[in-house]
Amino acid sequence: MTQRIASHSRKTAETDITATVNLDGTGTSAIETGVVFLDHMLTSFSRHSGIDVQLRCSGDLDVDDHHTVEDVALVLGKAIEEALGDKKGIERYGWAIIPMDEALARCSIDLGGRSYCVFKAEFRRPVIQGLSTEMVEHFFISLSRTMNANLHLAILEGQNTHHLIEALFKSLAYAMKQAVRVSGTRIPSTKESL
């Protein structure tokens, strides 16, 4: 099987980002975004999805976290999309319901090439360790856009902001683990193209 590894970079006046992913990795990561809680979430995503992620970002955090969070998602999504190649043999779909103490999150994903994100969650705290919680939804929207994925995320239960966000990232991780898994030899579509 061809190695499913890809790198993608983006440099603007606001951010300078490089990401490398290995879809058939062991969940190792080296994440540096400058946003402590985002680093924690991406490390958790890597560990639980089994996708190796190397990501470095230098952003205009003196302004706020918006550009960094958005651009990290755009670059990570594009690297994953490129690593998927022609998507021959992948499961394509993945889903997970993940608890974290009182929090319960659900994620369903379709890697079929149609970008759309539905996000249903509310957070009590406006900021957690440098991450504006309003940017969590924007992260997933941006990720789905460049990953060309249909992504549905929802909080089913919970109150603690840390637990809610971490459960969302872990549910994405387990859904991705399933969706990128190679289990056949054909493109998983009646169109024979994704």
UniProtKB/Swiss-Prot annotation:
Record SUPFAM superfamilies: Ribosomal protein S5 domain 2-like
Uppermost EC category: lyase
Record flagged with keyword RNA-binding: no
Enzyme Commission number(s): 4.2.1.19
Keyword entries, A-Z: Amino-acid biosynthesis, Cytoplasm, Histidine biosynthesis, Lyase
Key word Cell inner membrane present: no
Biological processes per GO annotation: L-histidine biosynthetic process
Pfam families to which the protein is assigned, alphabetical: IGPD (PF00475)
Gene Ontology CC: cytoplasm
CDD domains (UniProt xref): IGPD
Pathway: Amino-acid biosynthesis; L-histidine biosynthesis; L-histidine from 5-phospho-alpha-D-ribose 1-diphosphate: step 6/9
Catalyses which reaction(s): D-erythro-1-(imidazol-4-yl)glycerol 3-phosphate = 3-(imidazol-4-yl)-2-oxopropyl phosphate + H2O
Matches recorded under PANTHER family: IMIDAZOLEGLYCEROL-PHOSPHATE DEHYDRATASE, IMIDAZOLEGLYCEROL-PHOSPHATE DEHYDRATASE HIS7
HAMAP family to which the protein is assigned, alphabetical: HisB
Protein name: Imidazoleglycerol-phosphate dehydratase
Source organism: Chlorobaculum parvum (strain DSM 263 / NCIMB 8327) (Chlorobium vibrioforme subsp. thiosulfatophilum)
Lineage, broadest ranks: Bacteria, Pseudomonadati, Chlorobiota, Chlorobiia, Chlorobiales
